C-alpha cells in the first residue's frame, strides 16, 4: 500500500495520526508515515542516535524467504532478481550515504560500534511487460518492497525500523524492459532512499 493510500484509509476509518508524524523528516522516537515528502513509506525511530558516532554501515544478507517466487513466464526473472537483490540494495545504500558522508558501507554482520541493516524482501514484482510497452502513465511498473531494522552491531539495540517500496520502468518503454533488471533497479532505489535517511541523524 502506498503512503497516500494508507493515510486516506486511516482518515476514512476515523483513526488518528500522532501530531507531527505524517510527512516529517523526523529523527526523534515515533512512527512517520510517510517519512518526509514520500521519501520513505514508513520509518519508526525507536531510539535517537547520531550517525557520525558510528564507524560505518554493514548490510546483513537480506531475507528473501518471504517473497513470492513468481508465476508463469516471469518466475525465472523473479528468481534471478531475488538472487541479485543483496547487491542492488547495497549499491543503492552506498549511493545514498555517499551523497553526504564518507562512512564505509559494506556487506556483512558488522562489528564494533557500527550500524547494521537487517532487511527482508517482502516482494519483488515484475509488473506487466505488456502494459509497460503500450499503456504508459505508470502502468506495468516493476517494483520492490523491503522492510527491516537498523541495529547497533556491538549492542544489538534496535534504533530504527523501515518499510519502503519503489517502482521502476513505469511508462512506455521499448520492448517493455527486462523485468529482472527493473526489479533490481527498484531494490537499488529502496537502498538509496534509506541511505539518505541517515543524513538527518
Spans of model-derived segments:
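Short, small-residue-rich loop/turn micro-motifs
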Residues: 61-66, 123, 162-168
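Bacterial N-terminal signal peptides that target proteins for export
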Residues: 1-9
Amino acid at each position: 500500500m502506498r503512503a497516500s493510500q494508507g493515510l486516506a484509509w486511516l482518515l476514512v476509518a476515523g483513526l488518528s495520526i500522532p501530531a507531527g508524524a505524517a510527512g516529517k523528516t523526523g529523527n526523534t522516537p515515533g512512527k512517520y508515515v510517510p517519512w518526509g515528502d514520500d521519501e520513505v513509506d514508513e520509518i519508526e525511530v525507536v531510539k535517537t542516535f547520531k550517525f557520525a558516532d558510528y564507524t560505518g554501515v554493514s548490510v546483513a544478507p537480506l531475507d528473501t524467504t518471504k517473497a513470492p517466487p513468481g508465476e508463469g513466464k516471469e518466475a525465472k526473472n523473479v528468481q534471478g532478481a531475488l538472487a541479485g537483490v543483496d547487491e542492488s540494495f547495497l549499491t543503492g545504500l552506498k549511493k545514498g550515504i555517499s551523497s553526504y558522508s564518507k562512512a564505509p558501507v559494506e556487506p556483512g554482520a558488522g562489528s564494533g560500534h557500527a550500524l547494521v541493516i537487517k532487511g527482508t524482501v517482502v516482494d519483488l514484482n515484475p509488473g506487466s511487460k505488456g502494459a509497460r510497452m503500450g499503456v504508459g502513465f505508470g502502468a506495468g511498473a516493476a517494483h520492490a518492497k523491503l522492510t527491516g531494522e537498523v541495529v547497533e552491531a556491538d549492542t544489538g539495540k534496535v534504533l530504527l525500523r523501515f518499510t519502503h517500496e519503489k517502482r521502476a520502468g513505469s511508462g512506455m518503454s521499448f520492448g517493455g524492459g527486462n523485468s529482472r533488471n527493473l526489479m533490481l533497479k527498484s531494490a537499488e532505489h529502496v537502498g538509496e532512499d534509506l541511505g539518505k535517511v541517515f543524513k538527518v541523524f
